[in-house]
Design a protein with these regions (language model features):
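Conserved histidines in hydrophobic membrane contexts and catalytic metal-binding motifs
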Residues: 26
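Short hydrophobic/aromatic beta-strand micro-patches
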Residues: 44-46
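Catalytic core of pol beta-like nucleotidyltransferases
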Residues: 1-23, 32-36, 48-97
Length: 97
């Protein structure tokens, strides 16, 4: 299945809210409108209240289960500045607290 950005928002928002993340932005092929059946979902997360790796693992699992697709979950705190500047032009906000 190839999701629309609105479908991605509908799946991600309740999960993000339940975990207390500050924001989620879509990047990669879905954000650029180039997704195929084989595309994974690339999400940049500002963790907000999330501090433990265990809870981040739960967030990852719930999003992956929601999308039924491979997922690339990157945190703003864990990504280097060069990577963030490279994806910034393609980012699409999908959740903001």
């Amino acid at each position: 299945m190839i999701y629309t950005i609105e479908q991605i928002r509908q799946i991600a928002r309740p999960i993000a809210a339940a975990y207390g993340v500050r924001s989620m932005r879509l990047f990669g092929s879905y954000a650029r409108g180039e997704a195929t059946e084989d595309s994974d979902v690339d999400i940049l997360v500002d963790r907000g209240k999330l501090r433990s790796g265990f809870v981040m693992g739960g967030l990852y699992a719930d999003l992956r289960d929601g999308f039924q697709k491979d997922l690339d979950l990157v945190t703003t705190q864990g990504a280097d500045a060069e990577f963030l500047s490279r994806i910034r032009p393609d980012e699409v906000m999908i959740y903001e607290q």
